[in-house]
Each structure stands twice: as C-alpha cells, then as structure tokens.
From Swiss-Prot:
One annotated GO molecular function: 4-alpha-hydroxytetrahydrobiopterin dehydratase activity
Keyword Lipid metabolism: no
GO BP: tetrahydrobiopterin biosynthetic process
Family named by the database record: Belongs to the pterin-4-alpha-carbinolamine dehydratase family.
Protein name: Putative pterin-4-alpha-carbinolamine dehydratase
Keyword vocabulary terms for this entry: Lyase
SUPFAM superfamilies per UniProt: PCD-like
CDD domains cross-referenced by the UniProt entry: PCD_DCoH_subfamily_b (cd00914)
EC class (word): lyase
Any single Pfam family the record assigns to this protein: Pterin_4a
E.C. no: 4.2.1.96
Catalytic activity: (4aS,6R)-4a-hydroxy-L-erythro-5,6,7,8-tetrahydrobiopterin = (6R)-L-erythro-6,7-dihydrobiopterin + H2O
InterPro entries per UniProt: PCD_sf (IPR036428), Pterin_deHydtase (IPR001533)
Length: 98
C-alpha cells in the first residue's frame, strides 16, 4: 500500500523534482509543474505518452492543457497527500520531455 511521504522521505524524493521546476501546490499537499511545448500537437503528444504510464501505474494526474502548455498537479488522493507514486510519475513526465 502506498503511504503519504513522511518528513524523512519527502526531501530525498522531492528535492530533485524541485530542481526541475516542480513546486509545492499552494494550500494542499500536492506538487505542480507547467510544461511548455512548441505547439498544441507536442503538448497533446506529451499528455498521450504520460497517460499511458499513468494508466499502467493506476495513478492519474490532475492536469489541464491550454494550447502549448500542460499544467500537472500530482497528489495521491487515497493517502491525502504526496506519495512515492507522485514522485515516480513526476520523474517519468520529466523524462518524456527530454
């Protein structure tokens, strides 16, 4: 079972993500990042690739797309906050853009 990150595990899992542009979501235990692409097609392609991984891992993002931008919010609703699944999906999403 996935658990909410403890104070001891948050730093090692989240600090590398903060270095790549992820940030804490204001007012809740979640992380957020906005990706910017050349155009809508690239943005939608990213969402399609990310959706395949999200479905495979049964961990689905809150996200929105406006033209060439995709804003992603990750939190694990079952545990009421950020878990290792969020860090895993964030790393995968970052990898899909490189």
């Amino acid at each position: 079972m996935t658990e909410k990150l403890s104070d001891e595990t948050r730093g090692p899992l989240l600090e590398p993500l903060f270095a790549t542009g992820w940030e804490l979501e204001t007012g809740r235990d979640a992380i957020r990042k906005t990706y910017e692409f050349a155009d809508f097609v690239e943005a939608f392609a990213f969402m399609t690739k990310a959706a395949i991984w999200a479905e495979k891992w049964n961990h689905h993002p809150e996200w929105s797309n406006i033209y060439n931008k995709v804003t992603v919010v990750l939190t694990t609703h079952d545990v009421g906050g950020v878990s290792s699944l969020d860090a895993k999906l964030a790393r995968k999403m970052d990898g899909l853009t490189s």
